[in-house]
Every structure is written in structure tokens, then in C-alpha cells.
């Protein structure tokens, strides 16, 4: 009786279980991001000029960020009440079904205005699923971690972001290289959405093999049960919610400026062909992946808060260089820009999950960490690509950099107000 849980909660099982789910979730999320720039403006929003169509497409992209806090509240409630395992499986299925459905949607030419409406509904479902996935995956890792390695364990689910992005970008690159533009726009773009069902099956199988974390089991035995975790958060952990949210804003903004905005601006305004734009993105993501574990190691040595403050200051400075890198179609400058931005993203993203989770006790941690992370997504990412494109088109790309610098200053203030990690384990 005692050996089975220990076997299932081995280091390999825990870390791979936390990584595979976020990889699948972010793959699903990013294939939508690529399609929102490369495909959806023509298929779901015809009749407008290219800039307006792109903005309309990116508006559907933002819907997921608005629905993610709903997923956080819903799945967080059950994750704190009945356990991490069941909730992680349910969140994965919600995201997966929504993504696969997009692959079967007819275009505007076939069913008219119903097409973008159905697209928005599926995007809403993606957001709900991801809102419940991230927090649970992080907790699966850090609630099984020794105290001196929480950032290291917590970075494994964070690695799902660059891996998912590499898979999605690589898939789109392969498809655009292997078929004509007409075939790609006709049916090729659907392949990644439908094929994601295979990844969901793998993730579902692995998640069903995971047992509850020791922290959750101890919490059920030793603490009073919280009837409504969300209400407890608002009543007793309001400061952690507010300042944790603002602390994470810059992480979201820098990422979506480096991916969605940079890909859109480079291919539509700087004259870089789509294939080269995708190659730049894929290459820069390697820096994202490399610096996630680097930042986790540093964070375990000097503290999560201190590591995040250093990264945020660097991002604020980086904002002043947008004009230098993005004022021309020089592919070397654009690539350098993307690589620096993604490296900074790795520095801030690696320890973030651990930092946010340590702000809350076990019985509301799923809800608390998920809500702070996903509310930051609304503020930092929901409308970021649209705002950035508008700023760059109306004024110049230097204003996009200023946008990032201002956000970084807000996050820096939040980190300074949060005086120390609370380690509520």
C-alpha cells in the first residue's frame, strides 16, 4: 500500500508529468497564435485591408486571455477542493477539444459571420483549459520538490512554453515549405489543430498515472477545508493577488511582443518573408528554452524575488532599443532582437511559477497561483499584439518599446512591494 504512491510520484514521473501537459497546452495555444497572423485574417475576416483584418484576427486571439481567469477560478476551485490530478486531466481535455474543433471549422466564405463566431467560441474554450492547466502543472512539480530546489522543479512545466512554441512553429514551417500557398490556406493550416488530438491522448494517459502531491494530502489531513477558495483568496490574500498579478504582467507582455507582434510586423511591414519570420522565431525560442533552467538555478541560490527583479530591470532597459532593431528589414538585427528578447523572457519566466505559488498556502494555492498568473495575462497579453501594432503603425516601433518599459516599471514596483517569498509550504 505504501510503495505504490512512492513509485508513481518518482522524480521522473512528476517532472515529465508536469512538462508534458504544459507542452501540449502551449502547442495548442501557439498554433492559434501563428494562424491568427498567417491564416485567419484571410479566411475568417475577409473584405478588410490587411492591417484591419490582422487586428480583427488578433482580437479573437485576446479572447483566450479573458477566459483564462474563469478557467483559473473554476479549475482552481476543484484543484484545491478535490485534488490536483483530476483537475489537470479535465483542463487538458477542455483545451484539447477546443483546439481540435478549430481544425474542422468552415471559413467565412462557407458560412458567413458564423465562422468567426465559432472561432471565438473555440478560442474561449482554449483559454478556459489553459487557465486551469498552468497552475496545476506548476504545483505538481513544486509540491513534490525539496525546499532548496523549488525553482528548479518549478521550471519543468515552464519549459512546456518554449517546447510547445518550437513544435508549433516547426509544424507551420514544415507545412508552408511542403505545400503551395493555395493548399496551405485551403486545408494545410488545419493539420496542426487536428493532429494535436494525438498529443492530448498522450497527455491524458500520463496524467491519469499521477497521484496527488504530498502537500495536498497533508493539507487535507491537517487544515480546515476551504469551502470556496476564491472567496478566501479575496478576503485573506488580497495583496498577494494584486501585487502578484502586476509582478507577472511584464512576463506576458515581453513574450507576446517577441512572438506575435514581431512575426506580424516583420512579415507585413519590414518585408521579411513568412518563412524567414518563422525561422527567426524558432531560432530565438532556443534562447528562451536555455535561459529558463539557468534562471531557475540562480533563483534557488539568490531567491526567486531577487532573480525576477534583475530580469525585470533588464527588460525595462531592453525596451529602449526597439527602434534600433526594428526600424528596417535587416534580418540580422531582427534576429538579434528576437534572441535578446527571448533570453530575457527565459530569465523572468523560469522562476515565476515558483514565486507565485509560494505566495499562497496549500489549500488555496491552485486558485491563487492560477488567478495571479492569468489575470496578468489579461493585463499584459490579451490586447498586447493589437496595441503594439497600433502603436507601431500610428507612431513608430519606439513607442512599442516604451510600452514594454512602462510595464516593466509597474512589475518592478510590485516585486519591491512584495517584500519576500513567503514559502507557505
Give the ranges of each region predicted by the language model:
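C-terminal ends and interior cores of transmembrane alpha-helices
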Residues: 93-111, 314-328
